[in-house]
């Protein structure tokens, strides 16, 4: 069985161990983002810190839900910096993760660009009177 230690954006010390389902074994590696269950109804996006084969003793381990990246979003150098920051400032590494990752990488779906919606009037609303009728229909 394969296990992964995950950095989660929660104010608790340490890493959280999850089991890696067989279909995901080739995808889970250091630095990729994963979606994991945390508590009864919450999911979090975390970063894989280590992949290993040692099961934690006396703890029920849950499965990873999904691998979000094909390439790592964190390098080994960045991770060492995060560890140093957590030690120096006596902060959980999850808080360092929250501060270090850009907002687009914290979401499950990744970066979502802002979009604008354009509306075009049908030809029958092309006149000034038709425009007023259309505006009245949508309630201004």
Residue ranges with predicted function:
Residues 1-140:
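Accessory, non-ATPase domains that flank or precede helicase/AAA+ motor cores in DNA-metabolism machines
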């Amino acid at each position: 069985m394969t296990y992964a230690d995950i950095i989660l954006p929660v104010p608790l010390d340490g890493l959280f161990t999850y089991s890696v389902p067989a279909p995901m074994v080739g995808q889970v590696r250091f630095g990729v983002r994963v979606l994991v269950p945390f508590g009864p109804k919450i999911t979090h996006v975390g970063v894989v810190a280590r992949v290993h084969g040692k099961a934690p003793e006396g703890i029920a381990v849950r499965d990873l839900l999904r691998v979000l990246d094909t390439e790592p979003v964190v390098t080994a150098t960045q991770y060492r910096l995060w560890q140093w920051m957590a030690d120096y400032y006596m902060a959980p590494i999850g808080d360092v993760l929250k501060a270090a990752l850009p907002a687009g990488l914290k979401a499950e779906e990744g970066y979502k660009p802002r979009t604008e919606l354009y509306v075009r009037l049908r030809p029958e609303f092309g006149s000034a009177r038709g425009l007023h009728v259309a505006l009245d229909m949508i309630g201004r």
